[in-house]
Amino acid sequence: MTGVISSSSIGEKINEWYMYIRRFSIPDAEYLRREIKQELDQMEEDQDLHLYYSLMEFRHNLMLEYLEPLEKMRIEEQPRLSDLLLEIDKKQARLTGLLEYYFNFFRGMYELDQREYLSAIKFFKKAESKLIFVKDRIEKAEFFFKMSESYYYMKQTYFSMDYARQAYEIYKEHEAYNIRLLQCHSLFATNFLDLKQYEDAISHFQKAYSMAEAEKQPQLMGRTLYNIGLCKNSQSQYEDAIPYFKRAIAVFEESNILPSLPQAYFLITQIHYKLGKIDKAHEYHSKGMAYSQKAGDVIYLSEFEFLKSLYLSGPDEEAIQGFFDFLESKMLYADLEDFAIDVAKYYHERKNFQKASAYFLKVEQVRQLIQGGVSLYEIEV
């Protein structure tokens, strides 16, 4: 007869499992996940331990989705994130202390992946109120890193840089966290890009790419190539940007990294429209739309429709306004600023200064929203 396994021994294994998740060590994390799952049925009754397991399984899947699509990896019996989230939500009322921290932190990570940035900040702020229960310095670095990502997407540059610095200082003290270190370099770079400090941005992107290449991580290699292209694009160096986007697309397609393809195809499409290379733009536009539909990416589908409204429909101002309303409803103010600039420049280049002026005014209004954005994140916890 098989003996009962103590919950403390399984708890130690879950801690070890989480260590491998944070290191992005998929084989070790998968091995422990399967082992722990088998042992749970033989474990003494402990509801908190079952909750801890559910939270860690959710975090495990977030790691897998970040690095490689589950469909490509063909990992057996891997539950969907949405199903895991539903299961954990049902048990939320029982969460206290460290488990409550994990729930809010992991849920914030999920919302961040869904590009629901304000919702992500809300959960991260709740997690921050429970950070007192976290004794592990690497876990604190994880929290700082995700806060930095969130503030970057909301264009709160100095908040993002400060959290990235705190995370980097911890990660560099520990071995086996090279992936997070290279991601910190990417965060520094993207924030420098927003500050228009292009040389600093390129330096950090190149460092990140070298590290991603050494780690043999195609997702991170592709993203870094994309970001270097983005840096060139931001300086209106369109011809220089194109090769980087092509290389990023090649990496994503070769490795079947579907979620990253709409973004890469969008910018290479937009560049070709700006350069007046309409036939090539159509080709990229078609592929980008197809990948967006396949990925179920509603935001990029709407962005490809925006390109059609601006460059192929006259422009269609009603459709453009509808797109702007959509971005505003999602609080995607940084994206709204960029697209309003594109429309303003479109009209300015065609010497329609009245309409250009109206859209430049829109840009200023959006910048006011971004600059005043800190108050949006003062969320009661």
Curated annotation (Swiss-Prot):
Contains a small N-terminal 3-helix bundle domain and a large C-terminal TPR domain, connected by a linker region. The 3-helix bundle domain and the linker region form the ComA binding surface. A RapF surface mimics DNA to block ComA binding to its target promoters. Interacts with PhrF via the TPR domain. RapF and PhrF pair of proteins acts synergistically with RapC and CSF in the overall regulation of the ComA transcription factor. The gene is rapF. Its main location: cytoplasm. It comes from Bacillus subtilis (strain 168). Monomer. Is monomeric either alone or in complex with PhrF. Interacts specifically with the C-terminal DNA-binding domain of ComA. Interacts with PhrF. Inhibited by PhrF, which prevents RapF-ComA interaction. Interaction with PhrF induces a conformational change in RapF, which is propagated to the ComA binding site and causes the dissociation of ComA from RapF. Induction: Part of the rapF-phrF operon, which is controlled by ComA. Disruption phenotype: Deletion of the gene has no detectable effect on expression of the srfA operon. GO terms for molecular function: metal ion binding. GO terms for cellular component: cytoplasm. The lineage of its organism: Bacteria, Bacillati, Bacillota, Bacilli, Bacillales. One of its GO terms (biological process) is establishment of competence for transformation. It is found in: Cytoplasm. Mn(2+) binds at L40, M43, E45. Belongs to the Rap family. TPR repeats lie at residues 101-137, 148-181, 182-215, 222-255, 262-295, 337-370. This is Regulatory protein RapF. Involved in the regulation of genetic competence development. Inhibits the activity of ComA, a transcriptional factor that regulates the development of genetic competence. Acts by binding to ComA, leading to the inhibition of its DNA-binding activity. May also affect transcription independently of ComA.
